[in-house]
Amino acid sequence: MKLKKKFLEKSKNIANERIDILMNFAQKELRCEKKERSKNYVLLSKKIAMRMRMPFPKEWRRRICKNCGSFLIYGKNSSVRIKSKNYSHVVITCLECKHIFRIPIKKSK
């Protein structure tokens, strides 16, 4: 049983490294105006996370549009606003599909 656990931990570490590499590639390709290749890299990284049954890393989760699957670079293909109408939150709008994300801001004590 210990051997299986070690194998799973090792494979999850490899999967995390590959996800990071693919997401960095997606970021570079989007800056070079290659949107389709960037979407393919995002899709591949999501498939790796699903196959390994692990959650997608939080640092990358908010950089992907949940509607169209494109990688978001703030100011280039997405806009970011801070609103405080009913509650304080960050509004991220994907400029490709016009999908809106709201991320609540926790108040510090």
From Swiss-Prot:
Cofactor annotation remark: Binds 1 zinc ion per subunit.
Catalytic activity: Endonucleolytic cleavage of RNA, removing 5'-extranucleotides from tRNA precursor
Domain of life from the UniProt record: Archaea
An annotated Gene Ontology molecular function: ribonuclease P activity
GO biological process, one term: tRNA 5'-leader removal
Compartments (UniProt record): Cytoplasm
Classification via Gene3D superfamilies: 6.20.50.20, Immunoglobulin FC, subunit C (1.20.5.420)
Enzyme Commission code(s) on record: 3.1.26.5
Keywords: Cytoplasm, Endonuclease, Hydrolase, Metal-binding, Nuclease, tRNA processing, Zinc
Cofactors (names): Zn(2+)
Binding site for Zn(2+): 65, 68, 94, 97
N-terminal signal peptide: none
Any one GO cellular component localisation term in the record: cytoplasm
Enzyme class label: hydrolase
HAMAP family according to UniProt: RNase_P_4 (MF_00757)
Membership in a protein family: Belongs to the eukaryotic/archaeal RNase P protein component 4 family.
Quaternary context: Consists of a catalytic RNA component and at least 4-5 protein subunits.
Free-text function comment from the UniProt entry: Part of ribonuclease P, a protein complex that generates mature tRNA molecules by cleaving their 5'-ends.
Protein's UniProt name: Ribonuclease P protein component 4
Originating species: Methanococcus vannielii (strain ATCC 35089 / DSM 1224 / JCM 13029 / OCM 148 / SB)
